[in-house]
Amino acid sequence: MTQHSQSILGARVMALAIDFILLETIHLLFFILLADKLIQVTHFDALALLTFLILFLFVFSVSFLFLHMAYFTFFHAWSGQTIGKMIMGIRVVTNDNKFISPSVAFLRWSGYILSFVPLAIGFLWAVVDKDHCAWHDRLAQTRVIST
């Protein structure tokens, strides 16, 4: 692995960490407010609390996916960069160095799920791939470059 490809790989990891910290801070603040309302509504009635807790976990999970899908799809389609990628000085482009379309950005995000589900092997694949592409890069025919 060349020094340049190592630096991009490290920048990708840091960019993803920055994005997840940002997104989960927003997500957590939203759900702290929701949890406060949940406690007010249930008045600690055990059955009502259990029902609302199940609903809360469902909404939390769905909103997690939606928030991440919207964030990564929007930013990648808009500029090829999430906030984390902007900070780290990297960008997503097509294999022929063009900006990606919204549909490609969505496909790439969908690939995140495929990359993550089997023990994050799809993300780790970038370490051994000759072009340092993760599964979601291969699926969407994209790559990450320095800006």
Language-model features and meaning:
Residues 124-147:
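Hydrophobic alpha-helical transmembrane segments and immediately flanking/interface helices
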Residues 1-117, 146-147:
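Short, small/hydrophobic-residue-rich motifs at membrane-helix boundaries and re-entrant hairpins
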Residues 74, 118-121, 125-128:
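Membrane-embedded alpha-helices of multi-pass transport/permease systems
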